[in-house]
UniProtKB/Swiss-Prot annotation:
Necessary for normal cell division and for the maintenance of normal septation. It comes from the Bacteria. It comes from Cupriavidus pinatubonensis (strain JMP 134 / LMG 1197) (Cupriavidus necator (strain JMP 134)). One of its GO terms (molecular function) is metal ion binding. PANTHER family: ENGB-TYPE G DOMAIN-CONTAINING PROTEIN (PTHR11649:SF13), MSS1/TRME-RELATED GTP-BINDING PROTEIN (PTHR11649). Mg(2+) binds at residues 38, 60. GO terms for biological process: division septum assembly. Belongs to the TRAFAC class TrmE-Era-EngA-EngB-Septin-like GTPase superfamily. EngB GTPase family. Residues 23-209 form the EngB-type G domain. The keyword DNA-binding does not apply. Its cofactor is Mg(2+). Keywords: Cell cycle, Cell division, GTP-binding, Magnesium, Metal-binding, Nucleotide-binding, Septation. This is Probable GTP-binding protein EngB.
Length: 228
């Protein structure tokens, strides 16, 4: 069983000064307000109500932390970080400014951040705001793994095209970097439970969870991103 299944809520943060003062690794989840981010987090952690999604897209404007650790462990060994969804037009200007600043500052400056899970609707990958998120994060030299969510909405050929185009975009970003960084992508469907184990392997590897260390002799570190 994945240790992610034992994730539990830790804290909510509205300012960078309130981020947990810990040294444990973090994996952040980012995406547009309607990309299915909260649902995907719940599925990956095998829980129904770990991450809450507002009925009104764009309402959640805080950073939510979830601790990853065995149930009786006194301290977390890692964190999952649910970032505010972006791109919803009805958010007020002042709230949007604060929100964008919180997002950009966190992904660019948080030293504990080990990697970014970027969720995009498979029907509309790489919107302008998705590109902005990638461009904020790339200079950190840390990996990005794209989950093309709602893959159940597309045919097999449409999914193949979306994945191919996403990987091509990521290759373009990789060419801009002086030092190679893993920029990978996969198809994902919460409804059909597609791609769950692959995404869990990526996250476990970034967080150095015991399950990833146990699997290391059998598979190479780059394998999780190599889905077809």
């Amino acid at each position: 069983m994945s240790l992610l299944h034992q994730a539990r809520f830790f804290t909510t943060v509205n300012h960078l000064r309130d981020l947990p003062a810990t040294a444990v690794p973090e994996v952040a989840f980012a995406g547009r307000s309607n990309a299915g981010k909260s649902t995907a987090i719940n599925i990956l952690c095998n829980q129904k109500r770990l991450a809450f999604s507002s009925r009104t897209p764009g309402r959640t404007q805080h950073i939510n932390y979830f601790t990853v650790a065995p149930v009786k462990a006194p301290d977390p060994i890692a964190f999952l970080v649910d970032l505010p969804g972006y791109g919803y037009a009805e958010v007020s200007g002042s709230a949007k400014y604060h929100w964008q600043g919180l997002l950009s500052d966190y992904v660019q400056t948080r030293s504990q951040l080990s990697g970014l899970i970027l969720m995009m609707d498979a029907r509309r990958p790489f919107t302008d705001l998705d590109c902005q998120m990638v461009e904020w994060f790339l200079p950190t030299g840390k990996p990005v793994h794209v989950l093309l969510t709602k893959a159940d909405k597309l045919t097999n050929s449409e999914n193949a095209k979306a994945l191919r185009e996403t990987r091509k975009m990521l290759e373009g970003y990789a060419e801009q970097l002086a030092t190679p960084v893993p920029l990978t992508a996969q198809l994902f469907s919460s409804l059909k439970r597609r791609g769950i184990e692959e995404a869990q392997r990526v996250i476990a590897g970034w967080l150095s969870l015991p399950e990833a260390q146990a699997a290391a002799p059998a598979e190479q570190p780059a394998a999780p991103g190599a889905s077809e």
